[in-house]
């Protein structure tokens, strides 16, 4: 009788649960259809992103080529800068030489005038030989010709150096233009890196969605909602990272750090480091030189003292120690140096 009373109740419960199960089944079917639609949309978006990736890879290759070319050009510019520095030093030397030659020319002109005056005086006072005067004039003319030729050659060299300076100035302007291009390339590279990170995240979430789709139908809806929520949060985080980096100052102000300006900062820091290293080397070289000089002087004085004690006044220590030290200190010194003393020196010290 008890079994007969329980069977109708179980049937009623089963009948009540059937519509609930149908409702859950309908919900699951709708969720699965939504998932399929989302996956189709993701596939289309991924195809578009793949096309963009291919285009960006091509642009990256072209940018790498441009970077290699810019590096080569930078090396060539460094060599040109070195050459220009050498030429500038040569220019300075030439300017100094030209100044000296001009002074010599003035001195020669003055001396020629003085010689002419002296010749005129001597010609008035004493009848000089015409041949001697002709020789003097010929020598002076030869000297003047040599000085004029040297001045002309120096002027030609100055013209050449000025043309080289103009070419170097143009190269420096080109170098600044290429540096600006390099900064723009770096900015584009950073943007492309950010896009690649976004694409990787999309592929990762796509694989996670596919793995969630293969699970049993009972937990599919909750997993789908969790994945969508996580994906939205991740997109928000990545969107924040794509914005320009902002650094908070002490006065709570924001300073935008541009990625292209890092190149100039690195160049300046490298130049400062090299200058500091050179200064340190010069500092240690000078002190090492002073140290060697002091050591040489010390050994020289020590040699003089030993020579004096050996050949001039060997009894200096014997006469000076009793005057400087007391008897107790002399006995202590004798005890300390006893193993190293000979019989002659031992007899000199007090007992």
Swiss-Prot record:
It is found in: Membrane. It is a single-pass membrane protein. One of its GO terms (cellular component) is membrane. The chain crosses the membrane at residues 292-312. InterPro entries: SMCO2/5 (IPR026617). The keyword Transport does not apply. It holds the Pfam family TMCO5. Keywords: Coiled coil, Membrane, Transmembrane, Transmembrane helix. Residues 17-214 form a coiled coil. Belongs to the TMCO5 family. This is Transmembrane and coiled-coil domain-containing protein 5B.
């Amino acid at each position: 009788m008890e079994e007969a009373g329980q069977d109708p109740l179980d049937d009623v419960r089963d009948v009540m649960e059937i519509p609930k199960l149908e409702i859950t089944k309908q919900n699951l079917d709708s969720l699965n259809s939504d998932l399929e639609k989302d996956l189709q949309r993701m596939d289309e978006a991924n195809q578009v992103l793949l096309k963009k990736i291919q285009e960006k890879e091509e642009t990256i290759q072209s940018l790498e080529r441009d970077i290699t070319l810019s590096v080569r050009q930078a090396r060539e510019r460094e060599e040109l800068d070195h050459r220009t520095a050498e030429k500038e030093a040569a220019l300075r030397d030439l300017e100094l030489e030209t100044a000296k030659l001009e002074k010599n020319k003035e001195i020669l002109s003055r001396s020629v005038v003085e010689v002419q005056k002296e010749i005129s005086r001597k010609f008035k006072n004493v009848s000089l030989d015409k041949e001697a005067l002709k020789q003097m004039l010929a020598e002076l003319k030869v000297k003047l010709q040599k000085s004029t030729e040297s001045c002309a050659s120096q002027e030609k060299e100055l013209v050449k150096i000025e043309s080289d300076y103009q070419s170097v100035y143009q190269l420096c302007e080109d170098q600044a233009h290429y540096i600006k291009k390099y900064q723009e390339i770096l900015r584009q590279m950073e943007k492309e890196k950010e896009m690649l990170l976004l694409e990787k995240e999309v592929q990762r979430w796509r694989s996670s969605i596919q793995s969630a789709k293969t699970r049993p139908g009972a937990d599919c809806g909750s997993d789908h909602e969790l994945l969508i929520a996580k994906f939205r949060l991740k997109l928000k985080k990545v969107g924040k990272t794509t914005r320009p980096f902002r650094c908070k100052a002490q006065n709570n102000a924001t300073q935008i750090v541009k990625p292209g300006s890092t190149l100039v900062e690195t160049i300046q820091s490298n130049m400062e480091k090299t200058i500091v290293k050179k200064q340190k080397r010069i500092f240690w070289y000078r002190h090492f030189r002073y140290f060697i000089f002091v050591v040489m002087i010390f050994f020289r004085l020590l040699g003089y003292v030993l020579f004096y004690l050996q050949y001039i006044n060997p009894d200096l220590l014997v006469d000076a120690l009793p005057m400087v030290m007391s008897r107790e200190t002399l006995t202590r010194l004798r005890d300390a140096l006893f193993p190293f003393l000979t019989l002659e020196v031992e007899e000199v010290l007090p007992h």
